[in-house]
Amino acid sequence: LKRGKVAELRHTLAAESFAAVEKAKDPAEADDSWPRLRAQQQRALRLPMTGQAVLIDAGEEYDIHPRDKRTPGSRLAAWAFNRVYGRADVPFRGPHPAVVVRDGSSVRIEFADVGRGLRAQGPGETYPRRTKTNDYGKVVRNSPQAEVEGFALAGADGVWHWADKAEIEGNGVRVSAKAVSEPLAIRYGWARNPWVNL
């Protein structure tokens, strides 16, 4: 979703508030067009009165229009109650990075809007590929030793490596990868069909 598209839709619909649904999962392919699109959607949130139902933790691998409509619907409703109708008692978003600091060979990310605190969900055995046909795939973890799944680091060479360690510390997560002694960049859930658990 591009900023220009938001302005166009606001004009067409005569509505100031604008919320969209994040692209969830897509068939696991090698290119990174899907995570780039998610990043573009995130950047559009810098515009005033914009919101998003984050779905990186939901969806189905082989169906970009999954059967679960309750998850995006309830997340969009929470945003509308809080941001449009002024209901401060309704939380409308989950944890998001507030401060990122490199500490030797690790990176610490401090999160805002942590609610009752950060937690990592258990991995489970399977994930939905297409629920219409009762098709489930086996979970394969990229960081089996890490508490939090989905982080990757890169050094000066620009090569990404899945984190060997990603541990919750209070309202933050400390991330490290043995293959990256001096991390310069970090990302989370950067895949077409990521398995994430924070």
What residue spans do the PLM features occupy?
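A surface-exposed beta-strand-loop module
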Residues: 167-184
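Solvent-exposed beta-hairpin/edge-strand motifs
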Residues: 133-136, 141-156, 194-195
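Solvent-exposed beta-strand/loop surfaces of large extracellular or lumenal domains
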Residues: 148-172
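Conserved, well-structured interaction surfaces
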Residues: 1-75, 82
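Active-site proximal loops enriched in glycine and acidic residues that flank catalytic Cys/His/Asp
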Residues: 11-20, 54-56, 111-113, 155, ...
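Short acidic/polar inter-strand loop motif in beta-rich domains
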Residues: 182, 190-198
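Surface beta-strand/loop "capping" patches
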Residues: 83-140
